[in-house]
């Protein structure tokens, strides 16, 4: 029986979680996953922009090979025949699911790379908000209703 694989990638996350020694952060579930799984201690992103970095990780190709250096280009538009990491797992009998913002896609490509996923990725309808849950969007609306001096400094959504 094949092992289960849970791949978690987070944009803009510094190592400010317990398993990386940040005692002031309370992250018990992530810490437990790290304790019983594989924790990378020397991992580096290929580029400081989320879409090209994720495409690099998931394709195994550097950005100079994918040709993606911004958030406006799509992996299949640049490399239509590349076999992605989830696609490799899918081709070998695994069920692969996309939760959150994995590949950037447009309204023209709402499936978020169907070659890679066993089921279509959930799509919100707005190409830049599809990874938010309804609860997250409601919370952002509440924050936006606050006086400007009480809002977070970088409120986007």
Over which residues does each language-model region extend?
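Formylglycine-dependent sulfatase
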Residues: 1-157
């Amino acid at each position: 029986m094949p092992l289960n694989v849970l791949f978690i990638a987070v944009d803009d996350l510094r190592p400010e979680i317990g398993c990386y020694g940040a005692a002031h952060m309370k992250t018990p579930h992530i810490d437990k996953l790290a304790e019983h799984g594989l924790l990378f201690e020397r991992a580096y992103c290929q580029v400081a922009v989320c879409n090209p970095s994720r495409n690099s990780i998931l394709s195994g190709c550097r950005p100079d090979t994918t040709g993606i250096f911004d958030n406006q280009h799509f992996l299949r538009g640049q490399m239509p025949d590349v076999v992605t990491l989830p696609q490799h797992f899918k081709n070998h009998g695994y069920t692969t699911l996309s939760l959150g913002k994995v590949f950037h896609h447009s309204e023209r490509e709402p499936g978020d790379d169907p070659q890679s996923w066993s089921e279509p990725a959930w799509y919100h309808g707005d190409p830049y908000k599809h990874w938010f849950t309804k609860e997250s969007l409601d919370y952002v609306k509440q924050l936006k209703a606050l006086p400007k001096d009480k809002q977070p400094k970088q409120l986007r959504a």
